[in-house]
């Protein structure tokens, strides 16, 4: 009997930021994984149960940070064709951290950087990641809080 293959692979993206100073965390993937800069991201696993649970797990796995505060659902998702023939659908979230601490990188990444918002937008490799960050920045700016 073969395994079931669903048409979508659900994924999450976590835009981590600090308010003072205003910084955005970006991670650089290993060359084998594309070598590009992006926020924390990964697949939703069956054990997660919810997108927020997947965000918290991925952040812990990729940075060593335990998210204690609330997550912000950016009400933004995007999709792209995966190499496995499925469509990968990414749901974007954000979380504020108290300060720009050095992450403990997983073996998926080679570098990290806490960048000002404008530099983060220029550094992100993928347009969909830039769109998600722009959404966070616009939302926070309209509230008069958070990264600008």
List the predicted regions and their residue ranges:
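Active-site segment of metal-dependent pyrophosphate-handling enzymes
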Residues: 60, 64-101
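Conserved Nudix-box catalytic region and its N-terminal flanking loop in Nudix hydrolases
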Residues: 22-62
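Short, well-ordered beta-strand micro-motif
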Residues: 16, 92-96, 114
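Short aromatic/basic micro-patch
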Residues: 38, 87, 114
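NUDIX/MutT-family hydrolases
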Residues: 103-136
């Amino acid at each position: 009997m073969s395994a079931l293959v669903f048409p979508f692979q659900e994924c999450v993206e976590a835009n981590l930021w600090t308010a003072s100073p205003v910084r955005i965390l970006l991670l650089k993937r290993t060359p084998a994984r594309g070598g590009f800069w992006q926020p924390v991201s990964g697949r939703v696993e069956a054990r997660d149960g919810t997108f927020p649970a997947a965000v918290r797990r991925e952040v812990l796995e990729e940075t060593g940070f335990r998210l204690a505060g609330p997550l912000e659902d950016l009400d933004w998702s995007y999709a792209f064709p995966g190499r496995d023939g499925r469509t990968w659908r990414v749901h974007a979230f954000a979380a504020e951290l108290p300060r720009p601490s050095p992450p403990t990188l997983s073996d998926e990444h080679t570098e990290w950087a806490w960048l000002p918002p404008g530099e983060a937008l220029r550094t992100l490799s993928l347009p969909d990641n830039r769109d998600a960050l722009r959404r966070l920045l616009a939302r926070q700016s309209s509230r008069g809080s958070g990264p600008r």
